[in-house]
From Swiss-Prot:
L-aspartate binds at E173, R219, H451, R492. One of its GO terms (cellular component) is cytoplasm. This is Aspartate--tRNA(Asp/Asn) ligase. Aspartyl-tRNA synthetase with relaxed tRNA specificity since it is able to aspartylate not only its cognate tRNA(Asp) but also tRNA(Asn). Reaction proceeds in two steps: L-aspartate is first activated by ATP to form Asp-AMP and then transferred to the acceptor end of tRNA(Asp/Asn). Residues 578-590 have a biased composition (Basic and acidic residues). InterPro entries: Aa-tRNA-synt_II (IPR004364), aa-tRNA-synth_II (IPR006195), aa-tRNA-synth_II/BPL/LPL (IPR045864), Asp-tRNA-ligase_1 (IPR004524), Asp-tRNA-ligase_1_N (IPR047089), Asp/Asn-tRNA-synth_IIb (IPR002312), AspRS_core (IPR047090), GAD-like_sf (IPR004115). ATP binds at R219, D220, E221, Q228, E485, G537, L538, D539, R540. NCBIfam families: aspS_bact, PRK00476.1. Its EC number is 6.1.1.23. The keyword Membrane does not apply. The record marks H31, G81 as: Important for tRNA non-discrimination. Homodimer. One of its GO terms (molecular function) is aspartate-tRNA ligase activity.
């Protein structure tokens, strides 16, 4: 063995023991013939003392930060007054008798120090150095503890950890696929899975009944600040269950995760319907750490002469103390709204005497001015922000304003936790609305799925969802923590006729459905059981548990917000030879039957 002990595990009880440690030089300090080194390994750090007789003979004078070294010595108590109560090893030091440099270090691109600010590009380019910083190291340790806790719960409930394919066929699931050329079938392509959705349903048909997987998923989306093209999710599926069964298991699993950080999750968690969440909070993932709910005032302004409020929906949210804001800050709110696609954010201020003032107040009636503060719950000194237009977009704008007000006015304690389930979301939404929000609409119909095409309608909607898609509800449930959607799932469709009806609403006809999803539809013919499941975003879960700023902090080797990897410089061009060999430009053969067949393409090569 290269070492006998881990540096961070030494305590006062080890005083007098001979030890051999190995790790990195964190800091070095020289004090008149004595050198002190903070020796760091994965367990923490210990102070190493190199005295005169060893200092000259060991080459310790040449040591620099991040040299990899091995030392042998004796654990001693630190001199009186030199103990460090902020360090687990702060009562001891190791007086060394031998020192060996295992590997020197080149000059560092940045200091391995929590207190030094480092740009993200540099951190990701030298990620192996960034991970030596304790905070980043702890992120991956926490991630390991979380997956261990998850497995313990699911193992207790007799779940099977089963892998599903990484190379599969491209199927429309709501995002763009990453495609991989199939060299042995020129012109044909694999797709990396957006989720294990279809395979886990097939596992339920196969009789496995209880499946889970910590699965890698891939989505070729337009990159956003806190998204990754590849990510990890906890994927769970169960047969012969209803919504309550899945939620109960999910709560037990999540409670085990929060227990890691010393938080007792109160179960059962509250449930709120999707429509209630939108009406009260302007979000389908509401932050329940504070109130300050939005208020609909459409009826209040039903007879208004103010043209802006002559809209299908008018809503309001109060900013406590907002009347004292200078005009430039109200102008900044307008710009804030425009960055979210709105024309602006109308507002009224309530003076200390309770009189409505501001641009909107000049355009509404005396009766409306007299009643608006009471209607929305505003007090003297408050400001009221309004949104008017389509219901969904207006509610979303007010919901975003509510969150911004909560942060600016410190309406909640950032260390608090608020959990809930959002249930009974719409099964479908208009395709134009989905595309306008940047989503990929599956199918060519006027309606597309809100969650995915395999979500079952609620039992009450089973007979009417295709004749009245706008009123149909999904048998689905989302796990929300502090305004973050951490997990989501649903009871699945298990009957071929129901699945075909859903496809039809989405504009996926019988031939297309059979071509793209025939393997699933055919499986449903063989006694597919009722089943449901859930998936949790593991990256986001660990980020929240550890209080990290982005999911990149909890991924070992993440990519930037635009999908670039500074460490390996990926993605990168391929050579012309690779392109030819992979068949990137090849066209698939047309079989005699007319329909393109992967199977026939592969048969022609064997």
């Amino acid at each position: 063995m290269l070492r006998t002990h881990d540096a961070g595990t030494l305590r006062a009880s080890d005083i007098g023991k001979g030890v051999t440690l190995a790790g990195w030089v964190g800091h070095r300090r020289d004090h008149g013939g004595v050198a002190f080194i903070d020796l760091r390994d994965a367990s923490g750090l210990a102070q190493v003392v190199i005295r005169d007789e060893i200092l000259e003979s060991s080459g310790a004078h040449d040591l620099r930060n991040e040299y990899c070294i091995r030392v042998t010595g004796v654990v001693e108590a630190r001199p009186e007054g030199n103990a460090n109560p902020n360090l687990p090893t702060g009562e001891i030091e190791v007086a060394i008798t031998e020192l060996e440099v295992l590997n020197p270090s080149a000059p560092l691109p940045f200091q391995i120090d929590e207190h030094v600010s480092v740009g993200e590009d540099a951190r990701l380019k030298y990620r192996y150095l960034d991970l030596r910083r304790p905070h980043q190291h702890e992120a991956l340790v926490l991630r390991s503890h979380v997956t261990h806790a998850i497995r313990e719960v699911l193992d207790r409930h007799n779940f099977y950890d089963i892998e599903t394919p990484t190379l599969t066929r491209s199927t429309p699931e709501g995002a763009r696929d990453f495609l991989v050329p199939a060299r042995l079938a020129p012109g044909c392509w694999y797709a990396l899975p957006q989720s294990p959705q279809l395979f886990k349903q097939l596992l339920m048909v196969s009789g496995m009944e209880r499946y889970y997987q910590i699965a890698r998923c891939y989505r070729d989306e337009d990159f956003r600040a806190d998204r990754q093209p590849e990510f990890t999710q906890l994927d769970v599926e169960m047969s012969f269950v209803d919504q309550d069964d899945v939620i109960a298991l999910a709560e037990e699993t999540m409670a085990a995760c929060w227990k890691i950080i010393g938080v007792d999750m109160p179960t059962p968690l509250p449930r709120i319907t999707w429509h209630e969440a939108m009406d009260r909070y302007g979000s389908d993932k509401p932050d329940l750490r504070f109130g300050n709910e939005i208020t609909e005032v459409t009826d209040f302004f039903a007879n208004t002469a103010f043209r802006v409020f002559q809209a299908p929906y008018v809503g309001a949210v109060v900013m406590p103390g907002g009347a004292s804001l200078p005009r430039r800050q109200f102008d900044a709110w307008q710009e804030w709204a425009r960055t979210r696609g709105a024309k602006g954010l109308a507002y009224i201020t309530i003076s200390d005497e309770g009189v409505p003032e501001g641009p909107v107040a000049k355009n509404i009636s005396e009766e409306e001015k007299a009643g608006i503060a009471e209607k929305v719950g505003a007090k003297p000194g408050d400001a009221i922000f309004f949104a008017a237009g389509s219901k969904t977009s207006s509610q979303e704008l007010l919901g975003a304003a509510r969150l911004e007000i909560g942060r600016r006015c410190e309406l909640f304690d950032p260390s608090d936790w608020a959990f809930c389930w959002v249930v009974d979301a719409p099964l479908f939404k208009p395709t134009k609305e989905a595309e306008a929000s940047g989503d990929v609409a599956v199918g060519t119909g006027a309606w597309t799925a809100v969650h995915h095409a395999f979500t079952s309608p609620t039992p009450d909607c089973l007979d009417t969802f295709d004749t009245d898609p706008g009123s149909a509800l999904a048998y689905a449930y989302d796990f929300v923590v502090n305004g973050n959607e951490v997990g989501g799932g649903s009871i699945r469709i298990h009957r071929r006729d129901v699945q075909e009806r859903v496809f039809n609403v989405m504009g996926i006809g019988p031939e297309e459905a059979q071509e793209k999803f025939g393997f699933l539809l055919d499986a449903f013919k063989f006694g597919a059981p009722p089943h449901g499941g859930i998936a949790f975003g593991l990256d986001r879960l660990v980020m929240l548990l550890g209080g990290f700023e982005t999911i990149r902090d909890v991924i070992a080797f993440p990519k930037t917000g635009n999908g670039y990897d500074p460490l390996t410089a990926a993605p990168a061009p391929i050579t012309p030879a690779q392109r030819r060999e992979a068949g990137v430009d090849a066209k698939p053969k047309e079989p005699s039957g007319g329909q393109t067949s992967n199977a026939e393409a592969y048969k022609s090569t064997t």
